[in-house]
């Protein structure tokens, strides 16, 4: 069983909770509370991951990474996005130097800014 399958199954479960009862489902409760609550939880989990990594506690790093991924997937679903889209982006970047990719993003950002400034 591949990681892609695990992510796809988890994404399907998360999506199935979207209209669920907030009293019966943690994910439904997050969806019900909205964007700010979801993003706050992602931030909390990111901080916990960093703290575990700083401590070098390998089992806790894995556990916190799982929490972070899970909550990031809830955020993706909230915005109508899927893990497959993130995986496609990672595949697009595969084999590309991180420095080259960063430089290209900076160029694209400047182009987008100049387009906004010249506007209609």
UniProtKB/Swiss-Prot annotation:
An annotated GO cellular component: cytoplasm
Keyword vocabulary terms for this entry: Amino-acid biosynthesis, ATP-binding, Cytoplasm, Histidine biosynthesis, Hydrolase, Nucleotide-binding
Involved pathway(s): Amino-acid biosynthesis; L-histidine biosynthesis; L-histidine from 5-phospho-alpha-D-ribose 1-diphosphate: step 2/9
Molecular function in Gene Ontology: ATP binding; phosphoribosyl-ATP diphosphatase activity
GO aspect biological process, one term: L-histidine biosynthetic process
Compartment annotation: Cytoplasm
Enzyme class name: hydrolase
EC number: 3.6.1.31
Superkingdom of the source species: Bacteria
Major localisation: cytoplasm
Coiled-coil ranges (or none): none
Record's catalysed reaction(s): 1-(5-phospho-beta-D-ribosyl)-ATP + H2O = 1-(5-phospho-beta-D-ribosyl)-5'-AMP + diphosphate + H(+)
InterPro entries linked: HisE (IPR008179), PRib-ATP_PPHydrolase-like (IPR021130)
PANTHER family with a match to the protein in the record: HISTIDINE BIOSYNTHESIS BIFUNCTIONAL PROTEIN, HISTIDINE BIOSYNTHESIS BIFUNCTIONAL PROTEIN HISIE
UniProt record similarity statement: Belongs to the PRA-PH family.
The protein, known as: Phosphoribosyl-ATP pyrophosphatase
Native species: Methylibium petroleiphilum (strain ATCC BAA-1232 / LMG 22953 / PM1)
């Amino acid at each position: 069983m591949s990681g892609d399958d695990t992510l796809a199954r988890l994404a399907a479960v998360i999506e199935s909770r979207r209209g669920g009862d907030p009293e019966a489902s943690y994910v439904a409760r997050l969806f019900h509370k909205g964007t700010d609550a979801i993003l706050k939880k992602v931030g909390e989990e990111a901080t916990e991951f960093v703290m575990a990594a700083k401590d070098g506690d390998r089992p806790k790093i894995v556990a916190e990474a799982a929490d972070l991924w899970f909550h990031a997937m809830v955020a993706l679903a909230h915005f109508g996005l899927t893990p497959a889209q993130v995986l496609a982006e990672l595949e697009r970047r595969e084999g590309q130097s991180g420095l080259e990719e960063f430089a290209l993003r900076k160029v694209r950002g400047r182009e987008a800014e100049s387009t906004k400034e010249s506007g209609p």
